[in-house]
């Protein structure tokens, strides 16, 4: 344990302030966190409709498409189709409204096809199982890890996840239990 910690400190000192984890694409965030580190549990919280999903999709896009990392997104609020459409818009730089209406220029189609190729070649997995439990999530993550590799897991969003079913006293306690379970989520190496 001590030698492992010293080894990580030595590697960090040799990197001279560069990102030691998986970069997010947000320079200031990467500077503060040095990227997302293995086994980190990072919770993105804000009031409703503040852009949490858009923010984590930007991170997922950067990690999966620019850094070729294996990313699993578990979406309990939006469908897989909705997320893919948002990713199409992000990656192709085509306005989301144009994608929804189909009112696109020829140059938009070219960018969309190029973006679709990037998305299709990535190691991105989107799972939109409603009300998934922590045990189901753990099982799926292990399966994905064995089949594709897995560098990061994104869950959107925590409050819609079902607990262990042990009949906790309150929803607040159930959410707390789910959060603790995330910190113990381990994947085979």
Q: Where in this protein do the model-derived segments appear?
A:
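Hydrophobic positions on the alpha1 helix immediately C-terminal to the Walker A/P-loop
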Residues: 55
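Conserved small/polar residues in nucleotide/adenosyl-binding loops
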Residues: 182-189
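Pre-Walker A segment
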Residues: 1-38
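Short hydrophobic/aromatic beta-strand immediately N-terminal to the Walker A/P-loop
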Residues: 42-43
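Helical hairpin unit composed of two closely spaced alpha helices linked by a short loop
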Residues: 150-181
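Cytosolic-facing regulatory segments adjacent to core modules
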Residues: 31, 62-149, 163
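Conserved lysine of the Walker
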Residues: 52
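P-loop (Walker A) phosphate-binding loop of NTP-binding proteins
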Residues: 47
């Amino acid at each position: 344990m001590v030698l492992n910690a010293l080894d990580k400190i030595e590697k960090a000192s040799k990197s001279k302030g560069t990102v030691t984890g998986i970069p997010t694409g947000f320079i200031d965030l990467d500077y503060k966190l040095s990227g997302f580190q293995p086994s980190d549990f990072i919770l993105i919280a804000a009031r409703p409709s503040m852009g949490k999903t858009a923010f984590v999709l930007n991170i997922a896009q950067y990690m999966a498409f620019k850094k070729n990392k294996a990313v699993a997104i578990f979406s309990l609020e939006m469908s897989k189709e909705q997320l893919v459409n948002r990713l199409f818009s992000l990656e192709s730089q085509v306005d989301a409204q144009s994608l929804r209406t189909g009112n696109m220029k020829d140059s938009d189609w070219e960018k969309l096809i190029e973006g679709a190729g990037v998305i299709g070649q990535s190691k991105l997995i989107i799972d939109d199982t409603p009300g998934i439990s922590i045990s189901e999530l753990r099982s799926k993550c292990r399966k994905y890890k064995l089949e594709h590799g897995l560098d990061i897991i994104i869950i959107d969003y925590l409050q819609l996840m079902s607990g262990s079913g042990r009949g906790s006293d309150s929803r607040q306690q159930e959410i707390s239990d789910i959060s603790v379970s995330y910190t113990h989520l381990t994947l085979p190496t």
